[in-house]
């Protein structure tokens, strides 16, 4: 995924109301940009961090700038725009970067499924194999004690719990079911379920894996010009 036009940078003052952030532009002026991330953003929104933002050509938008990447004091790059995770996953599948998901004939997004009024992020299908249901989750939480250790989720997620129940049902019904962790933090080298944050999610994930749900974990190469989801890394839910 290339950023066109190129991203601009600013310094973060504060994030607030979940969807907004005040920044200082390179010109010295201050302003407000949109933040497409409703999560906790732990470690991703420290005042003084460098913010890389895109600019929409939609003149009707109240906040035309969108926060895409955080560059931390430690030099880590973090894609905080949660919309990008699904886009990156689709690109990675279509480009053949995720070998475990190759060989399918058709790719659909946001397809209704399950019994809890859900929409699957990605549905793969082919004439010679069962359908493959893929739920994509963005991983940006880096542990502050163990180097390289990432966690998901970064807050209690009832929505994520629902998705695990839906995936479990798909696996039990004979379909292929995938939980794809898209690691969007340059400092994360391995991922684990955040038992200390959402014990219920960790429990449901173990049940899902026993039922046949596969967990894939891919890390993105991140720069202020391009992001590619193309490197498999380890996942643990012990």
From Swiss-Prot:
Q: What GO molecular functions are on record for this protein?
A: DNA binding
Q: State the organism of origin.
A: Vibrio vulnificus (strain CMCP6)
Q: Which PANTHER family match?
A: SUGAR FERMENTATION STIMULATION PROTEIN A (PTHR30545:SF2)
Q: Which family does it belong to?
A: Belongs to the SfsA family.
**Gene3D superfamilies, per the entry:** 2.40.50.580, 3.40.1350.60
Which Pfam families does UniProt cross-reference here? Answer: SfsA, SfsA_N
The transmembrane segments are none
The name under which this protein is listed is Sugar fermentation stimulation protein homolog
């Amino acid at each position: 995924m290339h950023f066109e036009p190129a991203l601009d940078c600013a310094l973060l003052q504060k994030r607030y109301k979940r969807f907004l952030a005040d920044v200082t532009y390179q010109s010295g002026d201050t302003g407000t940009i949109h933040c497409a991330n409703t999560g906790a953003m732990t470690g991703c929104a420290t005042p003084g961090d460098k913010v890389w933002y895109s600019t929409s050509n939609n003149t009707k938008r109240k906040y035309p700038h969108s926060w895409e990447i955080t560059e931390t004091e430690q030099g880590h790059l973090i894609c905080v725009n949660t919309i990008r995770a699904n886009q990156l996953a689709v690109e990675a599948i279509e480009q053949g970067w995720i070998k475990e998901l190759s060989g399918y004939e058709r790719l659909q997004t946001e397809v209704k499924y399950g019994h809890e009024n859900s929409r699957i992020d990605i549905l793969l299908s082919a004439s010679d194999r069962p359908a493959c249901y893929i739920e994509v989750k963005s991983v940006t939480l880096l542990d502050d004690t163990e180097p390289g250790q990432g966690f998901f989720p970064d807050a209690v997620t009832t929505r994520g719990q629902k998705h695990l129940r839906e995936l479990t049902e798909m696996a039990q019904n004979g379909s292929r079911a995938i939980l794809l962790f898209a690691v969007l933090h340059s400092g994360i080298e391995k991922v684990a379920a955040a038992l200390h944050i959402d014990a219920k999610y960790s429990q449901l994930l173990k049940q899902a894996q026993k039922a046949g749900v596969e967990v894939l974990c891919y890390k993105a190469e991140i720069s202020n010009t391009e992001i590619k989801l193309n490197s498999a890394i380890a996942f643990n839910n012990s």
